[in-house]
């Protein structure tokens, strides 16, 4: 399928919202823009996906998130029932659409019978890695684009050790994605239904406290820290990423 056919496929899909369809209609006469958005899918690697947030096959949007998550879910399902029960921890940063994308991923995992622990709001990447290990999850997903400009978002994936996927798992997901139709090949469950059924569970303050306790337990010179704590000056920059948790916990710690 060439890029123009892919564009027409998306334009005709009932999966698109009215706003998404209008966005595509607005570029109907811009052949270069259509080619840029539909010449091929984003490449899935050990760091997952990253791209600008537009409607299109080569961009970050809820349909690409669902498609990527279906591929990830297929790999987890192949590990067996125990892996599905261990489930996936999901967090997000403060970028536009990050919460929407995180929920979209959670709904696909739930639709595949995989349990999800979803952070209620933005969290930093280290806390996701901690949650994966703390709760014995099979994997993790972080909706973030790190240092990239605000137009970008990303989909980072982690395995049970809290680290980014090893190459063989990333390759397995990439191969699965080649077999999945971005619209018809995705299984998903309504968010509220998944919460009621217990497939999606939210995480919040309790996990925050466990994470901070784990971090502060690593302090190896508490006496020195206590001496300088009241006068220590810190310059902090959010750099488009998770801000609320960091600042509030730093002030309490």
Where are these regions (language model features)?
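Cofactor-/ligand-binding subdomain signature composed of acidic, glycine-rich
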Residues: 1-67, 176-184, 201
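Gly/Ser/Thr-enriched, mixed-charge loops and adjacent short helices
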Residues: 33-38, 42, 153-244
């Amino acid at each position: 399928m060439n890029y123009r056919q892919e564009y027409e496929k998306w334009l005709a899909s009932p999966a698109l919202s009215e706003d998404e369809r209008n966005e595509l209609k607005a570029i109907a006469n811009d052949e270069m823009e259509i080619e840029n958005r539909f010449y091929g899918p984003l490449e899935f690697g050990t760091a997952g996906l990253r791209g600008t947030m537009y409607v299109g096959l080569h961009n970050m949007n809820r349909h690409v998130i669902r498609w990527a998550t279906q591929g990830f879910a297929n790999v987890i399902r192949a590990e067996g029932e125990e892996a599905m029960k261990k489930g996936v921890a999901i967090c997000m940063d403060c970028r536009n659409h990050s919460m929407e994308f995180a929920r979209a991923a959670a709904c696909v995992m739930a639709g595949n019978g995989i349990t999800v622990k979803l952070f209620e709001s933005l969290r930093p990447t280290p806390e996701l890695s901690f949650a994966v290990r703390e709760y014995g999850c099979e994997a993790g997903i972080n909706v973030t684009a790190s240092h990239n400009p605000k137009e970008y978002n990303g989909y980072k994936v982690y395995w049970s050790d809290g680290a980014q996927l090893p190459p063989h798992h990333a390759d397995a997901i990439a191969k699965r994605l080649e077999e999945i139709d971005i619209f018809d090949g995705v299984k998903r469950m309504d968010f509220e239904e998944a919460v009621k059924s217990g497939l999606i569970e939210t995480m919040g303050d309790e996990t925050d406290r466990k994470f901070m306790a784990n971090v502060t337990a690593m302090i190896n010179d508490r006496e020195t820290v206590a001496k300088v704590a009241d006068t220590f000056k810190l310059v902090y920059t959010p750099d488009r990423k998770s801000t609320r948790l960091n600042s509030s916990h730093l002030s309490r710690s």
